[in-house]
């Protein structure tokens, strides 16, 4: 029966045809799509370039190289999945290319003929049909006979776009896609072949083609039967090939139980580590959702009645069917008592690589070594130079074509770095470009930048001396022949929590005599042995600064397991507050790539038990009476269900200017504000802890709880991180307002010899005061010396008079 289903699907697939011009424009794409929006990825070059001619997709033979062979295996696996498909209702998803990651239109030129996007299909879904609807424009200077844009999916031919000089704009054009072409990770490529009269010049700006970012990909899927295997985690809750924001429901029997919440936080941070930049949300329920997947955490005797009473003999992980949805999976994290529940959660957080290919596992006790300061796995070390090959795969440092696009190297650092007199960091760049008479060296260069800020440009090939050329010809050249090497500096202010090095190759082909064509495809790369060196930095900074929290979870992530931090919750938190707590732990896990096994959960009555820790307070204003004392060192107060921001006195203003001279310009908003934080408005306040100097209190507050979730989500959104500044942020949706009013304090240490520089750094008032004091001391010393000299001369004169 399985073979019959497979043959039937293959017969259906071979009958798919490319549709001609669509009869009408595609439907308007809604703002909130149910498909995974993916970040733009570098185009992936197919192993064998397909023909630019328009042919029947069903008759186009796939490439025969190794890449196509592995692709074909994945396609056959996709077809075989059809044998287990039930009669579930199909779901139609609609992507725009912009949702798939295209920041703007995909523009192809002769020097950069390939553009593409990467997207995933969840492993528990099977594609039954798909269609690509494209629109765009092509240069009127292109020759229709030898110019085209070829569309491929996973190296399988989809269709061809040809120019019409009289009508440069095209579309919408519709192409049916054979569903057998889809795999878990897919590559949609647009390959441009240009032709013109006379000699072909790849750098000719008049030869181009553009595909609109509003083009659409429509996919119809049906669910596959669930496979409940712990080894598949994080599936089915999250599929790494689908780069979308993740929603994972949690079911907790009790709204406040410190041990159960700690276990839930460990699991949430592990899922945050897996989702990384995508973000994750954990809605909290008291009962199992009617459909889909969920995670249930609690003691076995307190689990929801719908699950029965599973028999456990210790810490246990178990996957069972959703009682209301046979396609849904419920992950049970349980044990006979609360300590065993925490142990079971560590089985996921620290033992995921050893999870079995089974639906149940008894978890053995796990000993976790304490973390050291600033050793989060996601932060690059500041004790040595770091190779770029340690940060990204070698393939991410390679480019094809004359202008292969930006090669990005993301990295993270603790944002509290400080260097003596703002000494810059060092970046050693090594790169390779083609040898021989291929490139016009005078016009070819590599641009280096960081966080979208330009740093330096270098020629792809420095002029070699005659001796070097002769040695290279006889095969005794230098060991690094063909590798260009340069060292540049990065100002410290350009480096913060989440960073990205950017390399952009811009090569120009060398004009060939007699209209001879040069190579159509060249390879250039940044050497993985290139290094970035932050070893001249020390860990010290001035707080409060919510920008550090938004970019790297600082100061709480100084210890990756949050062992120097505690979370303060109300005595009886509602589901919204608990959900915000889990979302925050997910954010911490995504920031450090480490589970939060060291964090403590306390109520406001037990804050004294964690007085020596950094504190995170999650509360509504109605429940904040017990935690208002924790903001004693801030300029803000909570009383009568309102957040007050008092007007600073003249004396305090002068003192703040002496502490931070930039505070005069940093806050342009009124300093006297009063708000109830209602209607979804949330407040994020940071100040020094009144319980221990050098410790931080971060309070996330909302009038009714609705704003708490929005505050945590803002922390994970890169587009809003730049708006999070100062010591207070008021948030209503994406509308953020920042304030700076509270006194500053220092977190971290530096060597003794660096203390004067740290104390005077960016503080002209301190320099003036020290200068005046120094002048007074010098004058006092001189006056005393002159007085002593005068007294000495007086005695000498008196002695001479007596002798005479």
From Swiss-Prot:
The lineage of its organism: Bacteria, Pseudomonadati, Pseudomonadota, Alphaproteobacteria, Acetobacterales. Tightly associated with the cellulose synthase catalytic subunit. The gene is bcsBI. Its main location: membrane. It comes from Komagataeibacter xylinus (Gluconacetobacter xylinus). This is Cyclic di-GMP-binding protein. It is a single-pass type I membrane protein. Residues 788-804 are cytoplasmic. It holds the Pfam family BcsB. PANTHER family: CYCLIC DI-GMP-BINDING PROTEIN (PTHR39083:SF1). Binds the cellulose synthase activator, bis-(3'-5') cyclic diguanylic acid (c-di-GMP). The chain crosses the membrane at residues 767-787. Residues 19-766 are periplasmic. One of its GO terms (biological process) is cellulose biosynthetic process.
């Amino acid at each position: 029966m399985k073979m019959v289903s497979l043959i039937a699907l293959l017969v259906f697939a071979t009958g798919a045809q490319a549709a001609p011009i669509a009869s009408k424009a595609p439907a308007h794409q809604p703002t909130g799509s149910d498909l995974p929006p993916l970040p733009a990825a570098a185009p992936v070059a197919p192993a064998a370039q397909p023909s630019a001619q328009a042919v029947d997709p069903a008759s186009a033979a796939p490439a025969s190289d190794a890449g196509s062979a592995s692709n074909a295996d994945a396609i056959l696996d996709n077809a075989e999945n059809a044998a287990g498909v039930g009669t579930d209702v199909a779901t139609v998803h609609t992507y725009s290319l912009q949702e798939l990651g295209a920041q703007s239109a995909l523009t192809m030129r002769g020097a950069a003929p390939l553009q593409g996007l990467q997207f995933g299909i969840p492993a528990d879904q099977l594609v039954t049909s798909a269609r690509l609807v494209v629109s765009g424009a092509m240069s009127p200077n292109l020759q229709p006979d030898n110019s085209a844009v070829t569309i491929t999916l996973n190296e399988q031919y989809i269709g061809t776009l040809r120019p019409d000089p009289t009508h440069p704009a095209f579309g919408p054009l519709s192409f049916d896609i054979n569903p057998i072409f889809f795999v878990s990770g897919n590559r949609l490529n647009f390959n441009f072949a240009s032709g013109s009269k006379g000699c072909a010049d790849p750098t000719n700006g008049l030869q181009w083609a553009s595909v609109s970012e509003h083009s659409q990909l429509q996919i119809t899927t049906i669910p596959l039967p669930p496979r409940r295997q712990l080894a598949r985690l994080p599936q089915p809750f999250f599929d790494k090939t689908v780069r979308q924001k993740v929603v994972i429901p949690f079911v907790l029997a009790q709204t406040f139980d410190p041990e159960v919440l700690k276990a839930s936080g460990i699991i949430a941070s592990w899922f945050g580590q897996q989702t990384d930049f995508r973000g994750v949300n954990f809605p909290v329920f008291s009962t199992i959702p009617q459909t889909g997947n969920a995670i249930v955490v609690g003691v076995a005797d307190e689990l929801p009645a719908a699950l029965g009473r599973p028999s456990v003999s210790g810490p246990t992980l178990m996957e069972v069917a959703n009682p209301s949805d046979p396609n849904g999976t419920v992950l049970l994290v349980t044990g006979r008592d609360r300590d065993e529940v925490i142990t079971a959660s560590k089985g996921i957080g620290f033992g995921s690589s050893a999870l079995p290919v089974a639906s149940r596992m008894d978890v053995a006790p796990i000993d976790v070594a304490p973390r050291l300061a600033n050793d989060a796995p996601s932060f690059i070390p500041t004790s040595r130079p770091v190779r770029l090959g340690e940060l990204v795969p070698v393939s991410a440092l390679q480019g094809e074509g004359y202008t292969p696009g930006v090669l990005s190297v993301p990295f993270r650092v603790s944002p509290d770095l400080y260097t003596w007199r703002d000494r810059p960091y060092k970046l050693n760049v090594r790169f390779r470009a083609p040898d021989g008479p291929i490139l016009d060296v005078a016009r070819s260069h590599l641009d280096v930048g960081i966080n979208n800020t330009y740093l330096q440009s270098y020629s792809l090939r420095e002029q070699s001396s005659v001796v070097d050329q002769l040695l290279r010809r006889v095969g005794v050249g230098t060991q690094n022949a063909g590798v260009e090497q340069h060292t540049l500096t990065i100002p410290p202010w350009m480096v913060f929590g989440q960073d990205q090095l950017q390399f952009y190759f811009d090569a120009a082909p060398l004009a060939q005599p007699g209209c001879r064509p040069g190579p159509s495809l060249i390879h250039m790369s940044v050497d993985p042995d290139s290094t970035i060196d932050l070893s001249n930095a020390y860990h010290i900074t001035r707080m409060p600064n919510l920008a550090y929290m938004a970019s790297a979870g600082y100061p709480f992530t100084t210890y990756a397991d949050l062992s120097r931090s505690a979370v303060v919750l109300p005595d009886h938190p509602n589901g919204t507050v608990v959900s915000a707590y889990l979302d925050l732990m997910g954010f911490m896990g995504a920031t450090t790539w480490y589970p939060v096994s060291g964090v403590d959960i306390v109520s406001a009555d037990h804050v004294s038990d964690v007085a020596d820790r950094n504190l995170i307070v999650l509360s509504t204003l109605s429940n904040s009476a017990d935690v208002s004392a924790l903001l004693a060192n801030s300029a803000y107060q909570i009383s009568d269900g309102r957040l007050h921001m008092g007007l600073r006195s003249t004396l305090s203003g002068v003192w703040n200017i002496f502490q931070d001279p930039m505070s005069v310009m940093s806050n342009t908003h009124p300093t006297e504000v009063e708000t109830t934080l209602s209607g979804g408005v949330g407040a994020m306040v940071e100040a020094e802890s009144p319980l221990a100097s050098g410790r931080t209190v971060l309070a996330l507050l909302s009038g009714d709880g609705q704003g708490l979730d929005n505050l945590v989500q803002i922390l994970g959104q890169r587009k809003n991180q730049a708006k999070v500044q100062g010591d207070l942020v008021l948030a209503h949706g994406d509308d953020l307002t920042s304030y700076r009013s509270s006194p500053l304090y220092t977190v971290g240490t530096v060597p003794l010899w660096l203390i004067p520089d740290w104390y005077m750094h960016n503080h002209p008032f301190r320099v003036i005061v020290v200068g005046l004091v120094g002048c007074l001391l010098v004058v006092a010393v001189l006056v005393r010396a002159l007085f002593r000299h005068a007294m000495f001369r007086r005695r000498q004169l008196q002695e001479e008079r007596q002798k005479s």
